[in-house]
Amino acid sequence: NEVSIWLDDKIVSKPNGIFAEDTYLVLGNSRFLETCDLKSNKLKIIADYGKGIDGIAADGKGNYFISDWSGNTSLVFPKGEILQLLDTSKQNINAADLCYITEKNILLIPTFFDNRVIAYKLIKD
């Protein structure tokens, strides 16, 4: 029963968002979305987002929704492509951590200072 450091790597700079999969963690930091293998501790960058990542949620298809504090919400694909879904920064609405309900295709985004949770129903084009 001893506490010890599990991972200490400079690539994980200012970590904030975290999402647990079966065999790895998905980490969002001040710039990158990356994975960390739970057995080997090996880090792999998925995407260069360029700014701080707050929320991370899986879509159940190998992609990840991410949010940042300024109000952007995006979908990140396995090869690193980033599709911006929402930008609420002009309305001064932050995007905090988020949650995706796969069975209902609903993305929940707490807005922090706006004092509400917004639910978005995702519909295929």
Where are these regions (language model features)?
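Loop/turn residues immediately N-terminal
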Residues: 31-34, 70-73, 113-116
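A short beta-strand motif characteristic of beta-propeller blades
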Residues: 2-9, 41-48, 81-88
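Beta-rich, blade/repeat-based domains predominating
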Residues: 9-32, 49-64, 68-70, 91-105
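Blade-level signature of beta-propeller repeat domains, shared across WD40, Kelch, NHL, RCC1
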Residues: 94-125
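Short active-site-adjacent structural elements
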Residues: 73-75, 84-85, 92-95, 116-118
